[in-house]
């Protein structure tokens, strides 16, 4: 719980990755590009260090550094005066006045303004470099959208949110049904013709077999060798013919016995086949065998697979958002339970932050979904599929689980096929939901690992592709900023904005040690005399949000 | 490693770390010395806002140390081969891990399924011989009895076919199994890429259990490897880093994928005697989209099968590239339909208004958000506070103008970690 108590604990990469990264050296093809973008904050960390030609230059540089030191101190003391009145010691005031006389107010104010401009322009520049086109019509449309949104009611907003996704799902279903109809109309007549032809061939060979046996029996031949050779030859022929009928034309044992061909390409099985095509499962039983059927299968796949994958990915994103929301609530509940045992160590909030609506009970945690939780969800859903199929089909639980796993991973061997009758739609619903859950797992866990692995040992070209680890996910800074704006627009609460803002800004400022709360400012030496030196007092001196210092007896709990 | 160095490395993992920084981190310098290296050139004043520089003898000594280290490291820079090798090492290890996983899985599948397959051959051959004996003993029976026996023979055949056997497997005694090493490698490749032809599948319970466990760990490994290689190809396509991702590149990737399919279809038409061009193209499309019907699949020598495996992997890299270039944008746009804001419009609005902020001299994150969002009018969001780093021993470092009072500072400080 140490990370939760600090609130802003950042998720670092693994130690091994860090070591290997530090070992990385040398020849960077994008170094010129980095130097070209001097305004880019990424190049702030690229500089190898300061080089001084002589001690005189060193002295001048040290004098220049004071410009940024005095504004900070002056600004902090002014804020302190506003909050705590005239409690500041006299010698501190004299020190401030002396520095002000030395460098002048203009330098102080200019330095502060320049620093603030520099910090804020970084984020805007990083968004600017994301390469989005600057069109005047866009701003007009944006203004118009804002005017329309203010007039919309809650119901219309909800409809606007839901309808495009429902339309996408309906479009995919319609596309699948139309494809199934075409497969059925093309393949069904051809299938009947070929099956009847195969049955005719099989029964021709069977009749030859029977006639030869009867002829031998009528001749009263008693030689066993002649019997066996005749039987083997006919059985070989029959087996070969049966295998062709089984493998290519999907005849079954019952059809051969009754000499009656049943329909494999029914409308239901056509829908099942179309779904297994667009979801890339591909059982292969049945398959189109005519040229027209195969050409249509090629076109159907090229258009249908992207459409279906986008739809399932869309559903998967909704599922992942709900999972993140549920996990966040779980963390809040856990924090509430555990916080009862840590009342004595609650953090304090200074007056300034408290007046802006950030109380001490505000909890900020990074919601990183653990990988084993996502894997457990996947296995539980597969087991549920095993139970479902073992009830619908005469399969054992392990066979059903095996089929469910092969289907969820879209391997699709085709050795186990469910019946395609009344229960088919339940099976199709299970398959599509399972694929959405698989997409959710990839979205939550897989993407960050792919990005980390790909960018391992490499340098980032510019700020457009700069990465930030937020909430356990590796995202582009431009994407992060866009999502931040979306969140702020969606949630009108001021608290959310402030927290998100602080959260983002924490990743841009340079290194902050973990014991920042214990490090005193230079101008706080006088306060130390009035505060006890116990560790708890020092611990409670800093505000958890802005990390500013204040006196203990003025804390707000 | 120094404890601070871990945080430094973790924080800067997305940015460049130079040999000088590495050398200094390995020498256990203090945090202040680290940040000295990360400072910008003296000409940029804004870059110094987070640094407090002390004009004392101790500070001068530290700077001298830094200068010595800088001059020392620059004499022997490592370039060229070593850097490229270190860059590619992890990715090569990932590829070798995938290949080793495929080969090891193939070996285990042959171990599990080979004996089961031979047992299955033997049992069906025994059934076949018993059938011939029954047929001989019924030589004096009627036509109806003979037809019933033939129906029984048909049932035996179909049951054998469902278990993956062919007529030649059980009509004549067999000593070898179809689960050879190259067949197993082809099978494991199609499992891990989720193609799944289904022409050669595990039948025994042990084989199925192993297949489930094998796929749980193998499919993510293979997908990560293919996605990693696809990103390298995507990086090669980007000539200019500042170029916008346009529709032309998406079409280029799709045309490249279809071209690869067409060329491969021509090759398969030549190599497979029974396949026409349409059959070959059909097979390539069904394979590269990982549908994998299995009605058409390559059968041949070891070299031919290995070339087919390489074809599948290269094709999947191109397919993943197409998904990465075209699909991700489509999915993101589709998902954000109906949301509060379109991210593109937000970014464009910010860029349009950036010039106004610069002119007014009030460029700040909250100000930009307020104007772009137009929803917090009249509200004063809290300004983020930027503060400078102060080292642990700040109290022991005197100012230039306090040198006369150094003797009066005798108080000790207590620093306790949280």
From Swiss-Prot, chain A:
- List glycan-bearing residues: 220, 237
Cytoplasmic topological domain ranges are: 1-165, 316-368, 447-557
Intramembrane stretches, per the record, are 270-290, 397-417
Key word GTP-binding present = no
- Return any one Pfam family short name: Ion_trans_2
| Entry GO MF terms | outward rectifier potassium channel activity; potassium ion leak channel activity
Q: Where is the composition biased (Acidic residues)?
A: 134-151
The family line of this record is: Belongs to the two pore domain potassium channel (TC 1.A.1.8) family.
What protein name is recorded for this chain? TWiK family of potassium channels protein 7
User: Which organism encodes this protein?
Assistant: Caenorhabditis elegans
Q: What is the lineage of its organism?
A: Eukaryota, Metazoa, Ecdysozoa, Nematoda, Chromadorea
